[in-house]
Amino acid sequence: MNKKIIVPIILIALTSCSNENFISSSSSSSSFVSSSSSVYSISSEINDEYKIVLDEIAGEVNIHQPIQDEFLESPDIDLKSLGINGSKELSLPEAINLSWKSTLPKDKNFDYFLVRIDENNNFTSPLEYKVPIEENNIDIYNLKVGTKYYWNVEAMSNEESITSEIETFITFFNYPRNIFVEGVTNFRDVGGWIIDENTRVRQGLAYRCGRLNTSSSSTLNIEITDNGINTMRNYLNIKSEIDLRLIENNEVGSYEESALGSGINYYQCPMSYDGNILVNNKNMVKNIFDLLSDKTNYPLIYHCNIGTDRTGLITYLLNGLLGVNQEDLFIDYEFSNFGLINGTRSKESIKKTYVKTIDETEGETLSEKISNYLQEIGITSNQIETIKEIFIEKY
């Protein structure tokens, strides 16, 4: 693991150790196996009498909880009227339930069902989940928004297997893509947002979230669970962690290397949280965008304490640079109120600080204003183009 403290003229490298285990499913006995890059040959049924039939998924599948949809459909609604005040964990996505019916030979001992999900019908990079043979469904979290998925189920034994036909479903194109990582609040993909009628921000590259350990603790207390670590490493494939918390007052909570284990780049980019956090952290914002322009750092996470203010600033600058409209940037900022953030946040508060600073910067569009501001603090035009190449995709 590489640890890098990013302060002007300081770069330190350290190493660490690893930890792994599971994502989430409909029961504690179902488990995420891997995000595999193998090519699978799909076995045929033993005969026509024995089969697995997948239940049809009608319409597009929504990843948001109903209370989240209420806000997304009417973003100017008073969140307190929905009971949203940052005191409860409401940031998790809605599970997608996949189910099937099976007729298996009684004289064969099948060990488990293997559920495969992929974005292509060749299953070249499937997500795999083991389900006990006595069960016939699983809850899936963290799929991309606006994406067509292929899936099948295979009953596995040491001797033979029975495989279903391949079916499909589509996730509803409704951002943000919020993520379930056990032990971490306020977790979502930076990607998925619409730029224009032809382009959007690519999903699966950068994630914003809350802390992974207890802040301001004199002893290290890791809050992300083993399940959460496994989700980060083996499902989201995280390579780098950017920590925006302060070091001088131990806001980092004695955290000196990534809790995600060995091989993860850990960058400390301490930012103050008082006043206009853009103006007061110019050098650190420059260093963070240096990291964002390095393709080798992806996929990555960045976070402060609760993943809202300093994390929200970086997200505003990044997605605004890419061309996401300002109203969507405000929606993403206020979506943090669903997390366990011990308070509420309003777009009105940031309009008076860093949003105002950017609005007063030269440029015709928000993207141009942010680009010009970043260049004023030392980011090059080539770095900006690299960031756009990394994140912008056609759809």
Where do the PLM segments sit?
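Intrinsically disordered, low-complexity sequence elements enriched in Ser/Thr/Gly/Pro
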Residues: 1-2, 206
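Sec-dependent signal peptide recognition
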Residues: 2-9
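C-terminal motif of bacterial Sec signal peptides marking the signal peptidase cleavage site
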Residues: 13-16
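Bacterial signal peptide processing site
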Residues: 18-20
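N-terminal, intrinsically disordered, polar/charged segments of Gram-positive cell-envelope systems
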Residues: 23-44
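Cys-dependent protein tyrosine phosphatase-like superfamily
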Residues: 40-300, 313-395
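Residues at the beta-strand->loop junction immediately N-terminal to the Walker
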Residues: 303
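Ser/Thr-glycine-rich phosphate-binding loops at phosphate-binding pockets of nucleotides
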Residues: 306, 310-311
